[in-house]
């Protein structure tokens, strides 16, 4: 158990260092040596966990997506009414991501430029797992007649598609810097969507 915790701590140190370097120099200029120095580790230790800087970028994204799923699951099982949960979930899937990339928002385009082809495949799985969580809540709402008799899986997919326009890689660095404005627009969209499927 102690060894597992130590491994997680080292991995987090490496990923924290990666995100600081992404803010400072972007993915193209960043080297594994830079990451090791920033994390206060040997290059060998970094390579033990990650084989390349592309792997580091994906691990950083995976860490954010994991936080998103945890937040969605927490909201999904809360005691709030279905409509409130759906709105909070729609907001959370974006705001958790926005907050996570703030430090390196100016270099986010360069990150996706390097990893985009592989990322596009990977994000299908991210979205599929998020949609499953939304579908559970929608199914509950349909069953309790608080929501219209919509198809839960299809509606969950539509809700994700509607909010994808607010994902960090869909926004400019300037928009990413105006999170309050983005959140306001996102909230308005979520209100419209949830109202549209509510009885």
What is the meaning of each model-derived region?
Residues 1, 88, 128, 132-144, ...:
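C-terminal peripheral helix-coil segments that are non-catalytic and often amphipathic
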Residues 1-25, 29-38, 55-59, 63, ...:
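Basic, helix-initiating cap at the start of DNA-binding domains
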Residues 17-21, 92, 96, 162:
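Short amphipathic alpha-helical elements of helix-turn-helix/winged-helix folds
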Residues 40-50:
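Short hydrophobic/aromatic patch on the recognition helix
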Residues 53, 60, 64, 68, ...:
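Hydrophobic/aromatic residues within well-ordered alpha-helical segments
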Residues 59, 73-102, 155-159, 186:
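Hydrophobic alpha-helical connector segments
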Residues 94-133, 143:
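Short secondary-structure transition hinges
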């Amino acid at each position: 158990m102690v060894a597992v915790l130590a491994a997680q701590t080292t991995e987090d140190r490496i990923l924290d260092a990666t995100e600081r370097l992404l803010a400072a120099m972007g993915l193209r200029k960043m080297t594994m040596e830079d990451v090791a120095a920033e994390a206060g580790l040997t290059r060998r230790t970094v390579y033990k966990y990650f084989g390349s800087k592309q792997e580091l970028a994906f691990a950083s994204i995976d860490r954010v997506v994991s936080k998103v799923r945890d937040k969605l699951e927490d909201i999904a099982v809360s005691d709030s009414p279905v409509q409130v949960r759906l709105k909070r979930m729609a907001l959370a899937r974006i705001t958790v991501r926005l907050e996570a990339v703030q430090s390196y928002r100016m270099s986010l385009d360069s990150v996706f430029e390097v990893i985009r082809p592989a990322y596009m495949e990977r994000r299908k799985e991210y979205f599929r797992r998020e949609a499953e969580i939304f579908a559970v809540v929608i199914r509950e709402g349909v069953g309790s007649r608080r929501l219209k008799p919509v198809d839960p899986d299809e509606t969950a997919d539509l809700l994700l598609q509607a909010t994808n326009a607010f994902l960090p890689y869909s926004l400019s660095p300037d928009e990413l810097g105006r999170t309050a404005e983005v959140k306001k627009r996102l909230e308005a969209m979520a209100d419209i969507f949830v109202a549209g499927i509510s009885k």
